[in-house]
From Swiss-Prot:
Parts of the chain on the Extracellular side: 22-236
Transmembrane segments annotated in the record for this chain: 237-257
Compositional bias annotation for Polar residues: 88-109, 193-211
Protein's name according to its UniProt entry: Interleukin-2 receptor subunit alpha
Underlying gene: Il2ra
PROSITE patterns attached to this UniProt entry: SUSHI (PS50923)
One Gene Ontology biological process: T cell homeostasis
Residue ranges of domain Sushi in the record: 22-79, 119-182
GO cellular component: external side of plasma membrane
Amino acid sequence: MEPRLLMLGFLSLTIVPSCRAELCLYDPPEVPNATFKALSYKNGTILNCECKRGFRRLKELVYMRCLGNSWSSNCQCTSNSHDKSRKQVTAQLEHQKEQQTTTDMQKPTQSMHQENLTGHCREPPPWKHEDSKRIYHFVEGQSVHYECIPGYKALQRGPAISICKMKCGKTGWTQPQLTCVDEREHHRFLASEESQGSRNSSPESETSCPITTTDFPQPTETTAMTETFVLTMEYKVAVASCLFLLISILLLSGLTWQHRWRKSRRTI
């Protein structure tokens, strides 16, 4: 019995740290009149299982994680109400709104094609009674692509991409080189943008770590608290599990040794 317990404790201590991925502390930067989307998701990416109003997620399915080329689990939402008829009517109305919202969100990103790379996951399929907004926790190396919303055109001198990178010991997103302006005033902004581009053509230096960083936007308190909570809770549970296993192993070893010692004394 002891060798099996020792092996279980050893596996727990070695597997838990190996699953760790460096999460991006903040959300990707927002660009006015533009939306961003990931073409694929790197290993370790976490998606919260959020449910719309009137529904709640199952306790054992708090989030789903990208592992290999697929997501670790499927989110599920259950109703808070026991009224069957009211639940059906509400679900139908919410489903119609959800379909419209999903269609509107997909319009500006129709020209984007999802990558099919090893170690990446595609966009997770929607689950029943899902919230209209998805909350992702990206990992280092993740890139997101930006596009202007309908009615706006892009003014850019560089790629409309933001990448989560490690800089000076902290993770942060690069600033996308994209400005979205009204289609009716696009020609005016284009002329002024060309004149400014000739004056401000010096590339940014990425070799040194300045004291005050301007590349990465400051997060809101709510975003920081949410992402820190997911990260700390996950590792607190892992550490507590390892400690529990170690204590159990020590107790079982002590009891076994005591039993053998008493048995040996009786034989003497």
